[in-house]
UniProtKB/Swiss-Prot annotation:
Homodimer. This is Uroporphyrinogen decarboxylase. The keyword Ion transport does not apply. It comes from Thermus thermophilus (strain ATCC 27634 / DSM 579 / HB8). It catalyses: uroporphyrinogen III + 4 H(+) = coproporphyrinogen III + 4 CO2. Belongs to the uroporphyrinogen decarboxylase family. Substrate binds at R26, Q27, A28, G29, R30, D75, Y150, S205, H318. InterPro entries: UROD/MetE-like_sf, Uroporphyrinogen_deCO2ase_HemE, Uroporphyrinogen_deCOase. Keywords: Cytoplasm, Decarboxylase, Lyase, Porphyrin biosynthesis. It is an enzyme of class 4 (lyase).
Length: 341
């Protein structure tokens, strides 16, 4: 289907738009009644590996909310299966790695990712969506550090002690792990763009655990290589992290056309720091649990803080939480659409 709404593509290029485009991280998920009904029939991996069902889930928020972009429904760990990682997605916990990568043997056991063989269902989902979507489709992948944190820790972590111990104690091995993950995610993202994704987002959800000095030494060179490898595909790339206020300058230098801001980052400060670089964000997801008067106030605050500057994509500072009322998400879209009314 031809796009009837390219607002997000224009905003990602820093071009003027009549209003900010709006979409939400985790806009397809457990807060939706229709999604919960599907989950009664399918597990998360079953949805992701069934292109027709996965496309249906991806389309849910486009139809129900009127957002300006769809994001492919998947998990950031999805491509790791194709690298030989034994993992399970545990409800209310997240990915659990049954063969953690903590030594040279574990790193060398990671297979090169061949997307067409390892995740053909992801690429077929994209092709289905491109026939049906009136808005741009965002493909995505986890950033190397965030994926490494899962692989080394064995699952979600609060303190990242194992991953930091490897990083500090075995630097050469750390860089070998990051090189493998960087190459794999570059292939995965390029394959998504070639299948039809209009934009890409790189999620570095846990990189805020690092200091700026550690980011520059242990992560930034790999992110630079990742973004350089994506330039030939010619689609805008969003670079997002959580807790990254102290890393924004380095993240900008590492690459990406748009920088995603979490809700702890003051928007006026970030726009001054980043200059002409487009930004995405940054409503606190918890605001969506509040009364509509509070939601309106906070949405208007963010719009005012942006000051009408080009290159702003309205989003949350992290993903929608499952407890969120659907009508509150729809209300945010209506508030943004009022800007152009």
């Amino acid at each position: 289907m031809d796009l009837v709404n390219d607002l997000i593509l224009r905003a990602a290029r820093g071009e003027p738009t009549p209003r900010p485009p709006v979409w939400f991280m985790r806009q397809a998920g457990r807060y939706q009644k229709a999604y919960r009904k599907l989950r009664e029939r399918y597990t998360l991996p079953e949805i992701v590996q069934n292109p027709e069902v996965c496309a249906e889930v991806t389309l849910l928020p486009v139809k129900a909310l009127g957002v300006d972009a769809a994001i492919l429904f998947a998990d950031i760990t999805t491509p790791l299966y194709g690298m030989g990682v034994d993992l399970s997605l545990v409800e209310n916990k997240g990915p659990v790695i049954h063969n953690p990568v903590r030594d040279e043997k574990g790193v060398e056991a990671l297979r090169p990712l061949v997307p067409e063989e390892a995740v053909p269902f992801v690429l077929e989902t994209i092709r289905i969506l491109k026939r049906e979507l009136p808005v741009p489709l965002i493909g995505f992948a986890g950033a190397p550090f965030t994926l490494a944190s899962y692989l080394v820790e064995g699952g979600p972590s609060r303190r990242f002690l194992r991953v930091k111990a490897l990083m500090y104690g075995e630097e050469a091995l750390w860089h070998r792990l990051m090189e493998k993950l960087t190459e794999a995610m570059a292939r995965y993202l390029r394959a998504q763009a070639e299948a039809g994704a209009d934009l890409l987002q790189v999620f570095d959800s846990w990189v805020g655990a690092l200091s700026p000095a550690d980011y520059r030494r242990y992560v930034k060179p790999h992110m630079e290589r990742l973004f350089q490898s994506l330039r030939p595909v010619g689609v805008p790339v969003i670079h997002f992290g959580v807790g990254t206020m102290g890393l924004l300058e380095d993240m900008k230098e590492a690459g990406g056309d748009v920088l995603g801001l979490d809700h702890h980052t003051p928007l006026p400060w970030a726009r001054a720091l980043l200059g002409a670089t487009p930004v995405q964000g940054n409503l606190d997801p918890a605001v969506l649990l509040a009364p509509k008067g509070v939601i309106r106030r906070e949405v208007q605050r963010i719009l005012k803080e942006n000051g009408g500057k080009s290159g702003h994509i309205f989003n949350l500072g992290h993903g929608i939480v499952p407890e969120t009322p659907e009508e509150n998400v729809r209300y945010v879209v209506e508030l943004i659409q009022e800007v152009a009314a």
